[in-house]
Design a protein with these regions (language model features):
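Core beta-strand-centered patch of the WYL/Sm-like small regulatory domain
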Residues: 170-190
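Conserved short histidine dyad/triad with adjacent acidic residue
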Residues: 164-168
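N-terminal low-complexity or simple alpha-helical regulatory segments
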Residues: 3-162, 176, 180-183
Length: 190
């Protein structure tokens, strides 16, 4: 018998135009490929703590939501601790539903300063130029967030930092896709 995906039997679905992701239910297990080891992508708990704070301020009980996405109370105690990236995605998408805010991911990113990003924020703020800051984010983002890839693109005098979920099944979810954008718009501009 395979262990349950999450501690809770409650389920909710995250939708995007081309798929439905369901958390909290027994998944259809496929035979292992290769050695059968599955790598769980991790992220610092920092942004999950910000989301939990938003839910508390709005009067939502956190225990049920935490269990639905597979998080324990201790997972949200230290911003430097690591949680599963899929649980973080579940939390931000669930928060958007509970807060009835279709732009929650965007607002979450815009409501925090670059300094609220821990190591990545420190690197960005201590880079001599915006170009250097974005290059450093591309280089080091996986240290704090294994769930996204960053690509720094240069075109003439312009440049952009593009994020993409490492796990293809999570790509395109609305709130996770929009959160990183505004938080880097405040990086050093010289």
């Amino acid at each position: 018998m395979t262990p349950p995906l999450l501690a809770s039997s409650a389920a909710f679905a995250l939708t995007s135009p081309d798929r439905i992701l369901t958390f909290g239910v027994e998944p259809d297990r496929q035979p292992p490929v290769g050695n059968g080891i599955v790598r769980v992508l991790m992220i610092e708990a920092r942004w999950a703590i910000y989301i939990a704070d938003d839910l508390r301020r709005a009067g939502h009980a956190l225990d049920g939501v935490r269990k639905e996405v597979g998080l324990k109370r201790a997972d949200l105690a230290d911003p430097e601790s690591r949680i599963a990236y899929a649980a973080y995605v579940g939390l931000i998408e669930r928060a958007a539903l509970l807060l009835a805010d279709p732009a929650y991911g965007l607002k979450l990113g815009a409501s925090h300063d670059v300094r609220d990003n821990g190591l990545i924020g420190f690197l960005a703020l201590n880079s001599p130029t915006l170009n250097d800051a974005l290059a450093n984010v591309e280089r080091y983002v996986a240290v704090t967030n294994e769930g996204i890839d960053a690509v720094f693109e240069r075109a003439g005098q312009g440049f952009a930092l593009r994020f993409r979920e490492t796990d293809a099944s999570l790509r395109g979810l609305r709130h996770i896709r929009s959160r990183p954008l505004p938080r880097w718009s405040q990086a050093p501009a010289n």
